[in-house]
């Protein structure tokens, strides 16, 4: 069964949390946008702005800490023959061994232009926020039209939700004021902009369960933002 509905007053009492996000745009993204770094930066900023908007109802501030663009080559295997799970595993290993050593952050998402799986546009570990290897997800930039930017933003927010302890919503049992909610198993009727009562309950449980109790999202981030152009890791502040 789903959790009860959460009143606005109850939501206002939820603790403030901060997620410092790094987005890694793979080489496929670099090629898709014809090497236009400004276009990629604009795309990612708009996506993160959407994600942050979705999470305000949970009292979570999502900020873009870094954008890394793999302009010359991918640093993990990202090809159509790769399985979705293998890509997630490889990205998590790379994050732990490389990215975390260069930049402190809470969660990283790989944004790819490659169709890794006909039925999957994103994948993440569950209840893994703050884990060095598993606080990751990947999502496909599967929408060609700017007007459909929300589709990709919802995908990224959905995968982040898994890291925060959320499971998929049960069909016809969970409610968010729309026909589909962000944690619905699939997007069939257009993207939803809200989390269900069930997702909110899973998240609240994740915060208090001793085995999880993610500490990294307690810290308010600095305002400084960087993007990094691979492979020499040249750093530009904005």
UniProtKB/Swiss-Prot annotation:
| Stored Pfam families | Reprolysin (PF01421)
Q: Which InterPro entries match?
A: MetalloPept_cat_dom_sf, Peptidase_M12B, Reprolysin_adamalysin
Cystine connections: 130-216, 174-181
Q: List, alphabetically, the GO terms of the cellular component aspect.
A: extracellular region; plasma membrane
Which GO BP terms apply?
Answer: proteolysis
For this UniProt entry, the molecular function terms from Gene Ontology, in alphabetical order, are: endopeptidase activity; metal ion binding; metalloendopeptidase activity; toxin activity
Q: In which tissues is it expressed?
A: Expressed by the venom gland.
Its cofactor is:
Zn(2+)
- Superkingdom of this entry's organism? Eukaryota
The residues listed in the UniProt record as binding Ca(2+), with positions renumbered to this chain, are 106, 216, 219
Write down the EC number. 3.4.24.-
Q: Kindly state which keywords UniProt assigns to this record, in alphabetical order.
A: Calcium, Disulfide bond, Fibrinogenolytic toxin, Hemostasis impairing toxin, Hydrolase, Metal-binding, Metalloprotease, Protease, Secreted, Toxin, Zinc
The subcellular location is: Secreted
Annotated residues for binding of Zn(2+): 158, 162, 168
The effect of temperature on activity is: Optimum temperature for caseinolytic activity is 40 degrees Celsius. Activity decreases rapidly at higher or lower temperatures. No activity below 10 degrees Celsius or above 70 degrees Celsius.
Q: Does the record bear Disulfide bond in its keywords?
A: yes
Catalytic-site annotation from UniProt: 159
Q: Quote the PANTHER family the UniProt record gives.
A: ADAM A DISINTEGRIN AND METALLOPROTEASE DOMAIN (PTHR11905), DISINTEGRIN AND METALLOPROTEINASE DOMAIN-CONTAINING PROTEIN 28 (PTHR11905:SF32)
Function, as annotated, reads:
Snake venom zinc metalloprotease that is weakly hemorrhagic and has Aalpha, Bbeta fibrinogenolytic activities. Cleaves the Aalpha chain of fibrinogen first, followed by the Bbeta chain and shows no effect on the gamma chain. Has caseinolytic activity. Induces dose-dependent edema.
Q: Which family does it belong to?
A: Belongs to the venom metalloproteinase (M12B) family. P-I subfamily.
This protein's name: Snake venom metalloproteinase HF-1
């Amino acid at each position: 069964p789903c959790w009860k509905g959460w009143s606005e007053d109850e939501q206002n009492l939820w603790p403030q949390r901060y997620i410092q996000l790094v987005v890694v745009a793979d080489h496929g993204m670099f090629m898709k946008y014809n090497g236009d770094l400004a276009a990629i930066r604009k795309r990612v900023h708009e996506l993160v702005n959407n994600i942050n908007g979705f999470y305000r109802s949970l009292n979570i501030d999502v900020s873009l800490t870094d954008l890394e663009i793999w302009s010359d080559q991918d640093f993990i295997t990202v090809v159509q023959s790769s399985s979705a799970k293998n890509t997630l595993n490889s990205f998590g290993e790379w994050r732990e061994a490389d990215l975390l050593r260069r930049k402190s952050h809470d969660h990283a998402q790989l944004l790819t232009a490659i169709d890794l799986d006909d039925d999957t546009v994103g994948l993440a570990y569950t209840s893994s926020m703050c884990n060095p290897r598993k606080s990751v997800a990947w999502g496909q930039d599967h929408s060609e039209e700017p007007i459909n930017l929300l589709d990709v933003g919802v995908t990224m927010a959905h995968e982040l939700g898994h890291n925060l302890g959320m499971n998929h919503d049960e069909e016809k049992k969970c409610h968010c004021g729309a026909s589909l909610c962000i944690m619905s198993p699939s997007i069939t009727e257009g993207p939803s902009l809200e989390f269900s009562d069930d997702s909110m309950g899973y998240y609240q449980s994740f915060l208090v369960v001793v085995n999880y109790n993610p500490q990294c999202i307690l810290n308010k981030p600095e305002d400084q933002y960087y993007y990094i152009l691979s492979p020499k890791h040249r750093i530009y502040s904005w």
